[in-house]
Every structure is written in structure tokens, then in C-alpha cells.
Amino acid sequence: MTSSRTRVSYAALSKRINEKLRDAIKILKELGYESQHVSPKEFYDYMTEETPTGDTITIIDVLDNDFLIVHEIVEISELKKMGIPIHRRTIIMFHPKVYEAHFTATEYELDYALDKKDYDWLRVRINHAKSWLEDDYLPKHLVPRCRAILKRFSEGLLKEE
């Protein structure tokens, strides 16, 4: 089953996307991550394409949340580092590699949440990560990595609280 995430025209969002990309790249540099160039159009296409899992997070959700935009920039950057083109079918065509990029992005996102001391966000995303273990599309070889992320950030949350 595939689902297409909510669509808002590129023209309506391009300026906002550009501003948010700039802000996220600064945040990522502070976290020690050197992102690949991500154009506003690539970001838009990636965020509005179909997903095999029925993802319900929309481009608006991401633009409204600094943690999610950091996540998506890392995810797209990691895919580009693997030589994967970013377009409206990337997630469907390369979904096993997307999971690898997704986990790297999750680590940066949650490091940023720890840095910001946003423990509520950490709890939300740790719960999301638990559900990823039940995802039928998750490649089996990535289950240990998902568990390691859960362990690391659950322990980090306990230390901070």
C-alpha cells in the first residue's frame, strides 16, 4: 500500500522552504554535520512523494518543526551521499536505503533534541522508533540499529531527567 502525503503547491511553499533549509543547515553545522546541497525543489519533491508505509507526516508538519526539518535534511543528504537521486519516487524506488538514511537522520534529530533539552520531543520520537520495529518494510539487517538508537536515546533521556 502506498500513500501520498498532503500536497501544497511548490510555488506556495518555495520561499518558506528556502528559509527553513538555511536555518536547518546552520543547526546541522553546529551539530558537526556537513550536509549535501538540498534544493528547495528536491526537498519539496521528497516530502510530497508517495511512501510505502503510509507516512502521515506532511511537509507542513516538517516546516513547522525544527527537529523534523533537521531530520529530513540529514536524510536527503545521506541519500545523496549514497548516489541516490532525489525526486518524487525516491522513497518507493530506494526504500531499503531510505531506512539507513532515516536512522542517521534520527540520530542527529535526537541529538539536537537533547542539546535543546526538549525531553517531550525525545519521548515522542522514542515512541515512534519503537513502532518502527514493527514495520513490515524495515529491512531485517537494520533492526539492531533501530534498537541501538532506542537504547542510546532512552538512556540519554533517563540521564537528563
Predicted features and spans:
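Metalloprotease/metallohydrolase-associated module, dominated by Zn2+-dependent proteases
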Residues: 2-42, 48-49, 57-63, 86-161
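Active-site recognition of the HExxH zinc-binding catalytic motif
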Residues: 67-80
